Amino acid sequence: MGTSIPRFTFDTPTKPGNDFYALCEGEQPLVMIFLPAFDHPVTREYLTHYLKTYARLRGVRLACVVRSSARTVAQATQGAEFPFPIICDAPGVLYSYLGVEQARGLRSWSFAAQRIYKTAKEQGYRYDSSAPQILPLTLVVGHLGKILFIHSGRSQTDLPEDCTAIREIAREVTSTLAAGPEGPRTRCSDETLTLPDLVGWDDGDNDR
């Protein structure tokens, strides 16, 4: 923590070329939640929770990241607007940059995940149970992309349950920061990158 995500541009289902640092501006902290692909049962479950409880999201902002293209999400939602940004990262550049983990089999399961998959299967969803599954990542981000808090999920459902939980995480982080000594100086880049440019940003290798 204390380091910064470099500046980049991202696409949402309805608007391309958004500035990440512009998203980070303002007095309210930004909570970023990394999810699997948009059509994944876990993603659908938690996005539904966040939409239903969005009115409780006071004093904090939310952005969800999905491993799908903006076009795919736009087609699935028929161009509908979300009340919070959906950052589309089909190649998984942000996931790799931030070290979002994957796990196979029972290592990624929870009782909540079993329930979600059971319901999805009853609705016709098919999946490869042996394939690695993306584990969620929760960040609280401040000005200039400074990472204030990070939690790597230990299971597919180890993430904030709803917007009340998101609000409480942000409040706890801001209260802790206000009570403690000044954190390390933000390290950031003045260059605006695209998502693919993030690969190798920190080690100088931009040929990957």
Residue locations for each model-derived region?
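Short active-site neighborhood of thiol/selenol oxidoreductases, capturing the structured segment around
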Residues: 19-52, 61-65
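Short loop/turn microsegments at loop-to-beta-strand junctions
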Residues: 5-6, 31, 135-137
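Structural microenvironment flanking redox-active thiols in thiol-disulfide oxidoreductases
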Residues: 44-97
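A structure-centric feature marking long, well-folded core domains of fungal metabolic enzymes
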Residues: 9-11, 29-30, 56
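A short, polar/charged loop-to-alpha-helix boundary motif
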Residues: 156-175
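Thiol/selenol-based redox catalytic cores and closely related redox-interacting motifs
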Residues: 89-158
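N-terminal "domain-start" segment that seeds a small globular fold
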Residues: 1-25
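Cysteine/selenocysteine-centered motifs that mediate thiol-based redox chemistry or coordinate metal-sulfur cofactors
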Residues: 175-208
